[in-house]
Each structure stands twice: as C-alpha cells, then as structure tokens.
Amino acid sequence: MLILTRKIGESLLIGDNVEITVLSVRGNQVKLGVNAPKEVSVHREEIYQRIKALADDVASDTQQ
C-alpha cells in the first residue's frame, strides 16, 4: 500500500484522468473531492460492497 501525505488543497493523481483533492480535515474526518470521467465508477467502500453483493445475488439467481 502506498501511503501519501497531503495538505488541504493538495491533490494526487491516479492514472492520467482521476484526481483526488483534500478539501478539508476536521478531527478524524477527511473530506475528499474526486474528479474523474463519467465512465469511471467512484463509490465509498461500503456502498461498493453493497452493489457487489446485489450483483452477486442477481447472478446466482439467474444461474438457478
């Protein structure tokens, strides 16, 4: 795992077209801005896990 330190207003790039910017830090909460093309899905981890679980359920239902 790559670990980076960024200050408010600083960014990091993922590939050529995804930019993550630190917008604010308050206590133990960090607010991030994500600038990515529409074809790139961006989700919080817990939402992604729900989407994946629903897709897995649908896939298993169609195989039965």
UniProtKB/Swiss-Prot annotation:
This is Translational regulator CsrA. It is found in: Cytoplasm. One of its GO terms (molecular function) is mRNA 5'-UTR binding. Belongs to the CsrA/RsmA family. Pfam families: CsrA (PF02599). InterPro entries: CsrA, CsrA_sf. GO terms for cellular component: cytosol. Keywords: Activator, Cytoplasm, Repressor, RNA-binding, Translation regulation. Signal peptide: none annotated. Homodimer; the beta-strands of each monomer intercalate to form a hydrophobic core, while the alpha-helices form wings that extend away from the core.
